């Protein structure tokens, strides 16, 4: 039962990131329960396709990595040296899992938010036992780095975050997903673990995670089955969305690393009564400040979309 059925009145919804995906599901399946909707960096492409999503987001991951190196040029050499050291020394993380170059790449998963570059630079600056940011040939990877790498990449408290990452694009009868992110990465030589400068990956999951990370290993048999599945429940109804009457006000972040702005705008062009505010002033987490929601709310209010509510 949808929550508004319990409340016995339509809801005004605010969807951040994946919350925007849920918003379009609500508008597809239960529009009578929604009075108005706001989304921030979270309009999925309809029709949904995991392969299409990663074809758009991997170039954005590369661009964000380059922005990081542009800000901290010395880290090009430091990250390369760290990758070489990980390959040679094969250190273990606090939970016993291997600290690989692939896991180092995964540490860029928050490059689409602030202040991720600063956090990464600080971690890289303390990656070697020397601890002063210098590069010493043969230096050991520091315990401090391994602890912080573990903290940034483990999913002990939210294992379903990665487990369901690609299945949010499984909409009705579809082709097998078959590790869409890994497939896209394999076709991009610049993301190879031996490529330099080393590229960081964003919000993307890979088969090795379910082989190496203790909290994800139990899900591997299920993942192998789900990756071949072709029949899923429908998430979105394009026809119903085209006829949508519920006011939808969306913040689209032009440089969003996670939810491609071109795909968002393509979807919104086919959703009735939708309005987009496109901005490059904010990253994916722009809602945290005091500007974004106020802008969305004021636009909807001034348009008269909230007249029956407030």
Indicate residue ranges for each PLM-predicted region.
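Alpha/beta-hydrolase fold active-site neighborhood
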Residues: 90-229
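A catalytic-pocket lid/entrance helix-loop region that shapes and gates access to the active site
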Residues: 32-87
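Conserved hydrolase catalytic core segment
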Residues: 9-49
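Catalytic histidine-centered segment of alpha/beta-hydrolase-like enzymes
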Residues: 258, 277-295, 306-309
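Conserved alpha/beta-hydrolase "acid-adjacent" motif
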Residues: 116-120, 256-263
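Short alpha-helix in the alpha/beta-hydrolase fold that links the catalytic acid
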Residues: 123-125, 246, 260-268
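Conserved acidic catalytic loop of the alpha/beta-hydrolase fold
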Residues: 1-10
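Short beta-strand/loop motif that positions the catalytic acidic residue
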Residues: 244-245, 249-252
């Amino acid at each position: 039962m949808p929550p508004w059925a319990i409340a016995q009145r339509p809801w005004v919804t605010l969807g951040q990131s994946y919350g925007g995906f849920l918003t379009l599901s609500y508008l597809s399946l239960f529009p009578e329960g929604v009075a108005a909707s706001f989304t921030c960096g979270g309009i999925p492409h309809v029709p949904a396709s995991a392969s299409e999503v990663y074809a758009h987001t991997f170039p954005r991951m590369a661009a964000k990595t380059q922005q990081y190196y542009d800000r901290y040029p010395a880290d090009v050499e430091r990250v390369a040296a760290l990758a070489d050291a990980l390959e040679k020394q094969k250190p273990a993380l606090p939970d016993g899992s291997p600290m690989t170059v692939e896991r180092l790449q995964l540490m860029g998963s928050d490059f689409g938010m602030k202040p991720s570059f600063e956090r990464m630079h600080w971690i890289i600056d303390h990656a070697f036992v020397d601890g002063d940011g210098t590069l010493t040939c043969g230096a050991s990877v520091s315990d401090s780095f391994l602890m912080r790498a573990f903290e940034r990449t483990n999913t002990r408290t939210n294992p379903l975050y990665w487990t369901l990452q690609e299945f949010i694009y499984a909409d009705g009868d579809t082709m097998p997903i078959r590790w869409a992110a890994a497939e896209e990465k394999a076709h991009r030589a610049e993301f190879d673990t031996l490529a330099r400068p080393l590229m960081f990956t964003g919000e993307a999951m890979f088969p090795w995670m379910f082989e190496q990370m203790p909290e994800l290993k139990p899900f591997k048999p299920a993942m192998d089955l789900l990756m071949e599945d072709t029949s899923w429940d429908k998430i979105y109804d394009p026809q119903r969305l085209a006829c949508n009457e519920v006011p939808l006000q969306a913040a689209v972040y032009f440089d969003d690393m996670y939810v491609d702005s071109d795909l968002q705008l393509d979807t919104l062009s086919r959703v009735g009564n939708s309005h987009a505010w496109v901005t490059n002033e904010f990253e994916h987490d722009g809602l945290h400040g005091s500007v974004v929601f106020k802008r969305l709310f004021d636009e909807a209010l001034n348009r008269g979309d909230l007249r029956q509510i407030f």
